[in-house]
Amino acid sequence: IERIKLRGNDQVDNDREALALANKISKPDIHLLKARLLFDGGYYARARQELDGFKPTDVKTGLEYIYRLGRIYHNWGKTDEAISYYAETIRKGENLPYYFAANSSLQLGIIFEKQNDFAQAKKYYLKVLNMNFDEYQFSITNKAQAGLNRIKGK
């Protein structure tokens, strides 16, 4: 961690995330971390199970919990549940500096684009561009802009 603080840079989203994490002394919540790793490995049922009984300790962990549920259900193919959790994440987090609401909005744009509901897709892609958040800003906003470009004229 100290090496990241001394030699790290913030030119790329992943480096910014590592540097921000190194500068924050608090440890990540173990249940959220396990759920994220299980999700990344494609173990959606186990990731969902890891979040059973989770109790948020602050606003950020509460928001991440809702966001993680949306991501799990989305990749699990349970779109209606994902939409509900993404919408809740946006409602609770769009004015906070965390990336959860912005990425939820991006994911809703993607979902509605795939459903050929271009008006809704545009609404959520534009919402991303109007949010202020710290983590993954470059990649999330670029993906939202790419989504807008894809649906232009539809």
Over which residues does each language-model region extend?
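Solenoid-like repeat scaffolds
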Residues: A18-I25, D52-K60, I90-Y98, L129-E135
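Residue-level recognition of tetratricopeptide repeat
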Residues: R36, R71-H74, N103-S105, I110, ...
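Extracytoplasmic and endomembrane cell-envelope/extracellular-matrix remodeling and assembly machinery
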Residues: I1-G53
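Generic helix N-cap/helix-start motif at coil->alpha-helix transitions
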Residues: N23-L33, D58-R68, P97-N103, S139
